[in-house]
């Protein structure tokens, strides 16, 4: 490189040599060969510059001469450099080549110009020996600071000690596995260089404390082996480091929990357990889902007069919410935090977790009270909390008008909606039956390649909640807000369904004219998903929404087709029974003619709303790889459809299959409480089904056969009682009322009439 220096108004040129790769325009130039002269020097006389270069003949002799004059320390550094390069090439190169995050696009070596090896060698030797001098010294950029490793260990590692740099000062985006491998390399080199022998405990602890906890988890066996080789006992701070690394993550396995218990026993042998030890111990039990062991730990703390800290309360609350799913105990612990002392006052994170738990258990009013309490205390709210409140309010008839208000508060804070917020927008619009807005929001997700399974499920849910305009009595929730009106209008105007994205089969219209539009588009979308994303279709909640579309839009033929094509009975665990089917010839020929005519009309109507590609796929696919196994909720929908469309044959078919489902492994895997709840729900829908068909005696027989098992109430028996009154069956109506009274007293603790009279007589008023 040539630089121009002005001094005493006389310009002069100074050469600065550097190693660089020229551009392709310079690669075809022939390299000029300089005749051998004296060793490198530069003489400036009258503006003339003379520069000498070492030739190939003199290179060997000069290298030997320089190396003989080098001090011993520099020779050691050169040796370490060669060793360092060799070790790095063996350990890191193969993994970096296979790692997509760290591999860079390498240029073709055939296109690179030849590099002056002589000049590069001179520069390296000059930098090490300090003999290289330039007329203008330019300080090189400082390297990133290395880890503060103790000097004793740094001497054993040599140049390998510079392999790792702190995460905050490192500009490289190495994956976590690569960093862990680097630490393995470092520990391996230290083990070969003498290990931990001769090092003080303080030096060893300082070195191991530099390992990030997320990487330490996989290095614990190596470290324990190094202590064993050095015949040293592991001090309790190192054991605690092991425990902290093992408690990372959402869940802790039983094997990891055994190690944690073992390490805590070793710690207790060396020192008394402190508050931070108990905090970590309780956190580990929570993540291992053993909340019953926490009471024993708290009792042990009480005997040692150790006060329960805020962190312990926080871990217990989160354990009840996310691991035990015990909402009431979570609320009790949360209230204890608020009223116990000032030190244990819950922060915004605990408030957020409890609010989420309230929304999960449909206690929207309690969630809103906690939200306003949080704001009154001056705590910060976040985007996820607001979007979760919006989703919870949309489920409540009382607070559903506030749903969009919480979402628009996100924009008021200046936050950009994240993926969770966008999914909750889809959910609120879908639950409200606003198919047009849901389609537009999903179209936006297609444009940004951010479609998730949850978003797709909400799109199908919107079709199942659709109500034709002439039947809808309420306005869409988003239209009750001025900001919502502008938001909806802008979204719909910004979407052009005539331009499909990724082949997604939206019909080319932003307006939904009638129910046939919904049936046709949902069928086309299902066919597209079968071909492109079949893994989406194995979710029972998604299939339930897809089947409900035909149920809500009064199309039994389409409902039965979707029920059979999108779900199947999982026969795992069902005992095989030999069945004999007797088919009797039908004698009513006119009935067959009418049936054939009805089937022809039905097929013509179905051809409009059913995707032809889906029909072809169903004919060619015989297995259940694109179907979801049926659960109790799907059987409830099926028996409800049989009663709504008054199809006795389909009801008998579902009733028989539901009995087989109860013998399957999927039903037996449920808890006894859940099994009882599912059976009671199906029995309630069965009573409603027989009542809709005017089979009141059959409906009453279902109630009478399970009077000792199920807590029948007016919620399930009201339909049967009203139907009996309309048909003039007063005896049946009286019997139904007696069943309701008996079960309410037995299962709900309602006071009997005679007991109430006795109570009033004793009270005197």
UniProtKB/Swiss-Prot annotation:
Q: Does the keyword Ribonucleoprotein apply?
A: no
The UniProt annotation puts the region (Disordered) at 26-67, 92-114, 585-609
Q: Which InterPro entries match?
A: Pentatricopeptide_rpt, TPR-like_helical_dom_sf
GO biological process, any: mRNA processing
Q: Keywords of this protein's UniProt record, alphabetized?
A: Mitochondrion, mRNA processing, mRNA splicing, Repeat, Transit peptide
Basic and acidic residues: compositionally biased ranges? 42-56
Give compartment(s).
Mitochondrion
Which ranges are annotated Polar residues under compositional bias?
592-609
Note on file?
Involved in mitochondrial-nuclear incompatibility, a major determinant in reproductive isolation between species, through hybrid incompatibility of Ccm1 and its interacting partner 15S rRNA between yeast species.
What does this gene product do? Regulates mitochondrial small subunit maturation by controlling 15S rRNA 5'-end processing. Localizes to the 5' precursor of the 15S rRNA in a position that is subsequently occupied by mS47 in the mature yeast mtSSU. Uses structure and sequence-specific RNA recognition, binding to a single-stranded region of the precursor and specifically recognizing bases -6 to -1. The exchange of Ccm1 for mS47 is coupled to the irreversible removal of precursor rRNA that is accompanied by conformational changes of the mitoribosomal proteins uS5m and mS26.
Spell out the family assignment given in the record's similarity comment: Belongs to the CCM1 family.
Q: What name does the UniProt record give this protein? A: Mitochondrial 15S rRNA processing factor CCM1
Q: Please tell me the species this chain comes from.
A: Candida dubliniensis (strain CD36 / ATCC MYA-646 / CBS 7987 / NCPF 3949 / NRRL Y-17841)
């Amino acid at each position: 490189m040539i630089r121009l220096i002005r001094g005493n108004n006389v310009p002069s040129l100074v050469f600065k040599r550097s190693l660089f790769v020229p551009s392709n325009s310079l690669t075809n130039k022939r390299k000029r060969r300089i005749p051998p002269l004296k060793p490198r020097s530069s003489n400036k006389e009258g503006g003339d510059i003379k520069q000498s270069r070492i030739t190939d003949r003199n290179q060997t002799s000069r290298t030997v001469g320089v190396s003989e004059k080098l001090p011993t320390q520099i020779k050691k550094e050169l040796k370490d450099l060669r060793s360092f390069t060799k070790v790095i090439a063996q350990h890191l190169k193969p993994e970096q080549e296979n790692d997509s995050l760290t591999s860079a696009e390498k240029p073709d070596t055939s296109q690179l110009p030849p590099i002056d090896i002589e000049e590069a060698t001179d520069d390296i030797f000059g930098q090490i020996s300090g003999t290289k001098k330039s007329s203008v010294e330019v300080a090189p950029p400082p390297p990133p600071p290395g880890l503060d490793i103790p000097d004793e260990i740094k001497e054993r590692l040599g140049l390998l000690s510079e392999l790792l740099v702190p995460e905050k000062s490192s500009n490289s985006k190495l994956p976590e596995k690569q960093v862990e491998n680097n630490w393995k390399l470092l520990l391996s080199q230290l083990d070969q260089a003498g290990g931990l022998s001769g090092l003080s405990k303080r030096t060893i602890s300082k070195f191991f404390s530099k390992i990030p906890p997320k990487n330490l988890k996989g290095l614990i066996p190596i470290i324990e082996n190094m202590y064993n080789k050095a015949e040293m006992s592991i001090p309790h701070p190192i054991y605690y480091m092991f425990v902290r690394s093992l408690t990372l993550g959402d869940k802790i396995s039983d094997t990891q929990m055994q190690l944690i218990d073992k390490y805590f026993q070793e710690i207790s042998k060396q020192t008394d357990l402190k508050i931070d030890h108990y905090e970590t111990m309780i956190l580990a039990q929570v993540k291992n889902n053993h909340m019953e062991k926490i009471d024993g730990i708290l009792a042990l703390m009480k005997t040692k007069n150790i006060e329960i800290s805020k962190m312990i309360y926080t871990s217990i609350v989160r354990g009840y919410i996310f691991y035990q799913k015990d909402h009431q105990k979570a609320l009790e612990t949360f209230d204890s935090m608020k009223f116990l002392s000032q030190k244990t006052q819950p922060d915004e994170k605990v408030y957020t977790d409890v609010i989420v738990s309230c929304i999960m258990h449909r206690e929207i009013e309690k969630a809103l009270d906690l939200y306003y309490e949080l704001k009154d205390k001056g705590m910060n709210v976040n985007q996820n909390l607001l979007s979760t409140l919006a989703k919870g309010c949309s489920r409540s008839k009382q607070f559903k008008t506030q749903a969009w208000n919480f979402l628009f508060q996100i924009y008021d804070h200046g936050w950009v909606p994240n993926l969770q917020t966008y999914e909750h927008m889809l959910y609120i619009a879908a639950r409200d039956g606003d198919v047009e807005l849901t389609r537009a929001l999903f179209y936006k997700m297609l444009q940004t390649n951010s479609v998730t399974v949850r978003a797709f499920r909400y799109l199908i849910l919107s079709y199942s909640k659709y109500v034709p305009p002439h039947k809808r009595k309420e306005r869409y929730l988003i239209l009750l807000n001025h900001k919502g009106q502008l938001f909806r209008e802008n979204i719909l105007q910004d979407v052009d369904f005539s331009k499909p994205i990724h082949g997604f089969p939206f019909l080319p219209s932003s307006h939904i004219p009638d129910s046939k539009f919904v049936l046709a588009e949902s069928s086309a979308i299902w066919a597209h998903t079968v071909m492109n994303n079949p893994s989406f279709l194995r979710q029972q909640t998604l299939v339930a929404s897809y089947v409900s579309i035909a149920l809500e839009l009064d199309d039994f033929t389409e409902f039965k087709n979707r029920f059979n094509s999108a779900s199947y009975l999982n026969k795992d665990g069902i005992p095989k029974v030999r069945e004999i089917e007797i088919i009797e010839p039908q004698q009513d020929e006119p009935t067959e003619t009418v049936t054939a005519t009805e089937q022809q009309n039905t097929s013509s109507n179905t051809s409009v709303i059913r995707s032809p590609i889906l029909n072809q796929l169903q004919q060619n696919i015989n297995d259940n790889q694109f179907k979801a196994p049926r659960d109790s909720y799907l059987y409830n929908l099926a028996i409800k459809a049989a009663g709504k469309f008054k199809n006795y044959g389909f009801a008998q078919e579902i009733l028989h299959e539901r009995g087989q489902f109860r013998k399957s492994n999927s039903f037996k895997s449920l808890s006894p409480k859940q099994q009882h709840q599912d059976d009671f729900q199906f029995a309630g829908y069965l009573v409603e089904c027989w009542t809709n068909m005017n089979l009141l005696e059959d409906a009453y027989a279902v109630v009478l056969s399970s009077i000792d098992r199920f807590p029948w109430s007016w919620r399930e028996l009201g339909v049967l009682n009203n139907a009996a009154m309309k048909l003039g069956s007063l005896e049946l109506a009286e019997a139904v009322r007696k069943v309701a009274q008996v079960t309410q007293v037995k299962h709900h603790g309602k006071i009997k009439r005679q007991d109430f009279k006795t109570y009033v007589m004793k009270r005197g008023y």
